[in-house]
Amino acid sequence: MRVAKEDVEIKLQLPGVVMRQHKNFGDVGGYGRISGEYFTLAAGVDTTPLFQGLEGNLCQCPHWGYVLSGRITTTDAGGLKESVSTNDLFYWPPGHNVHVDDDAEIVMFSPQHEHTEVIDHMIEKTR
């Protein structure tokens, strides 16, 4: 799910203040602890080979995040592609691959246990 900043409802606007809120932005029920993550990614990075061996050869961990800069495209198990870019909020459900279209910096929040397993798998793939 991609949400452009301009599409997030303004709840309060005062001189020097704009507060926006997008409700129902995913459900973390049953996941336990969440980790905060900051990623710096170069254009051309593709997670497909790193996710080989995971269930469905995809990341099965959901992520909620914000794109500080750049552009990233995810592809789900059905082949559906969705791109996020600078200032977008995003939710990536389980079952995705990632391709970095333009150099990007993102902040993500992910279920800690599940994403640590994916990161550990990726580390093993690079050895």
Please place each PLM-identified region on the residue numbering.
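Short histidine-centered beta-strand/loop micro-motifs
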Residues: 48-58, 76, 82
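Double-stranded beta-helix
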Residues: 3, 99-127
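Well-ordered beta-strand positions
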Residues: 65-66, 91, 99
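Short, conserved beta-strand element in jelly-roll/cupin
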Residues: 56-74
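Short acidic-glycine-tyrosine-enriched beta hairpin
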Residues: 76-96
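Conserved hydrophobic/aromatic beta-strand scaffold that supports enzyme active sites
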Residues: 19, 36-38, 64, 81, ...
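A short, N-terminal "cap"/entry segment at the start of jelly-roll beta-barrel domains
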Residues: 1-48, 55, 127
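ATP/adenylate-binding site constellation spanning eukaryotic-like Ser/Thr protein kinases
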Residues: 69, 95, 103
